């Protein structure tokens, strides 16, 4: 499948610093964030005019799920649009707090761990063809996903009793299974809960919950693009070397603790391979595969950055990727800071910097400051992201949902939507079932909108 439906769900960390004596719990702060949403949507779980879903997840984490996208840049635009939507809620909530005499600064972090060691996720969704055994996909995909953090981890400082160490991934410490149907209880790498939000006879939805939330657009491009390409190769029957892991959970932690990519991980049957070896194999197959598929400038960018990143790891020279890959950008920032102020990695100021890197408020968040200084390579533009805040992707089912929501809100009509249903809550209770996520035009939806 060369045109694939993809989406990203991001949970955001919330904290608030108060100016006066009055204090609020994270739950209460999250409710302030969603007060405006509840006022028009009558719920803290809503779909927006751009086709996305916005809701308050368990544990007071706001979650933004992008609409269905069928290209990488489109997906990046809609993922970044989520940051703007949340930032808008943040500004509104701070004003409400101020109006009620509770002075405070709200912080929203696009990261995966808080100071108490809790983890929240960034989930990727890929539509895959149902043909063949699911185990074929998971067998090839698992070693790739376990080692993918080498090319697209967000990076973090891990405080251990002995010392602080720089790790590749924020999420790796919190993954407890390889393949499972649960997401919160056991945190697997691939989630098999089969809710395709499409024709279940044709498709399944692959739910990957192992990835880090990325700040860099280029890192998101690489994270999602490389996974989509591996899925495409699996569907095309490309043969890969067997890298079945002896213990995926131990391997994911070992890989995270090794920015050199050279430490061997145990494979099934007692063999060994490093994260770099494993990624090299998948990249080599991707380079080969690109010569046999239709041209795609986005995928060319993915394969190029993937190769440059592996070269950088191998040579221990990151100068050609240090504006593109999150963990490299972050580590360089820490090193500059340590050199300038003669401090250890374990210094609390580094931990603060680690957190501030993921602050989504423009002008305050460290990543945004780096971006404004031209120290970060972009994959898209501010204009395209701003457009995605209000407009759904024009090439997928999201357009039907977004257009329906816009029309119903304009007409003041009561409605209910989910990923596949559009319903007018009138006497007739007219409902349209949209099973095909690739379809952006539907006469039934046009008739429903016209009837308003």
Swiss-Prot record:
Binding site residues for ATP: 53, 66, 419
Any GO MF annotation of the entry: ubiquitin-like protein transferase activity
Keywords carried by this UniProt record: ATP-binding, Ligase, Magnesium, Metal-binding, Nucleotide-binding, Ubl conjugation pathway
Keyword presence, Ligase: yes
Residues at the catalytic site: 57
E.C. numbers: 6.3.1.19
Domain of life: Bacteria
Pfam families (alphabetical): Pup_ligase (PF03136)
Substrates-to-products reaction catalysed: ATP + [prokaryotic ubiquitin-like protein]-L-glutamate + [protein]-L-lysine = ADP + phosphate + N(6)-([prokaryotic ubiquitin-like protein]-gamma-L-glutamyl)-[protein]-L-lysine
Family of the protein in this entry: Belongs to the Pup ligase/Pup deamidase family. Pup-conjugating enzyme subfamily.
Protein name: Pup--protein ligase
Origin species: Gordonia bronchialis (strain ATCC 25592 / DSM 43247 / BCRC 13721 / JCM 3198 / KCTC 3076 / NBRC 16047 / NCTC 10667) (Rhodococcus bronchialis)
Gene name as annotated: pafA
């Amino acid at each position: 499948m060369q045109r694939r439906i993809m989406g990203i769900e991001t949970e955001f960390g919330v904290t608030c610093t108060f100016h006066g004596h009055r204090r609020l719990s994270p739950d209460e702060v999250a409710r302030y964030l969603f007060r405006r949403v509840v006022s028009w949507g009558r719920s803290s779980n809503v779909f927006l005019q751009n086709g996305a879903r916005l809701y308050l997840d368990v544990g007071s984490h706001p979650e933004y799920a992008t609409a269905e996208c069928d290209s990488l840049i489109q997906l990046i635009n809609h993922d970044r649009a989520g940051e703007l939507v949340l930032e808008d809620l943040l500004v509104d909530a701070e004003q409400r707090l101020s109006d009620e005499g509770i002075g405070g600064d709200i912080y929203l972090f696009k990261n995966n761990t808080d100071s108490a060691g809790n983890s929240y996720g960034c989930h990727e969704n890929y539509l895959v063809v149902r043909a063949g055994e699911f185990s074929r996909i998971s067998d090839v995909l698992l070693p790739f996903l376990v080692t993918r953090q080498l090319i697209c981890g967000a990076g973090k400082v891990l405080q251990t009793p002995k010392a602080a160490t720089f790790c590749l991934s924020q999420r790796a410490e919190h993954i407890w299974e390889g393949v499972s149907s649960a997401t919160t209880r056991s945190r697997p790498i691939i989630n098999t809960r089969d809710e395709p939000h499409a024709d279940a006879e044709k498709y399944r939805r692959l739910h990957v919950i192992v990835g880090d939330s990325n700040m860099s657009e280029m890192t998101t491009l690489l994270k999602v693009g490389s996974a989509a390409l591996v899925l495409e190769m699996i569907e095309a029957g490309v043969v890969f070397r067997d890298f079945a892991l002896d213990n995926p959970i131990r391997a994911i932690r070992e890989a995270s603790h090794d920015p050199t990519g050279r430490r061997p991980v145990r494979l099934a049957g007692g063999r060994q391979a490093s994260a770099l070896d494993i990624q090299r194999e998948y990249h080599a197959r991707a380079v080969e595969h690109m010569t046999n598929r239709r041209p795609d400038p986005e995928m060319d960018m993915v394969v190029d950055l993937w190769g440059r990143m592996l070269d950088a790891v191998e040579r221990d020279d990151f100068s050609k990727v240090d504006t593109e890959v999150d963990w490299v950008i972050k580590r360089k920032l820490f090193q500059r800071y340590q050199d300038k102020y003669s401090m250890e990695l374990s210094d609390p100021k580094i931990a603060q910097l680690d957190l501030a890197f993921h602050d989504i408020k423009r002008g305050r968040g460290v990543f945004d400051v780096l971006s404004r200084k031209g120290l970060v390579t972009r994959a898209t533009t501010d204009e395209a992201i701003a457009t995605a805040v209000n407009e759904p992707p024009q090439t997928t089912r999201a357009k039907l949902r977004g257009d329906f929501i816009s029309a119903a809100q304009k007409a003041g009509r009561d409605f209910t939507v989910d990923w596949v249903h559009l319903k007018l809550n009138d006497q007739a209770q007219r409902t349209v079932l949209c099973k095909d996520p690739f379809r952006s035009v539907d006469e039934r939806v046009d008739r429903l909108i016209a009837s308003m």
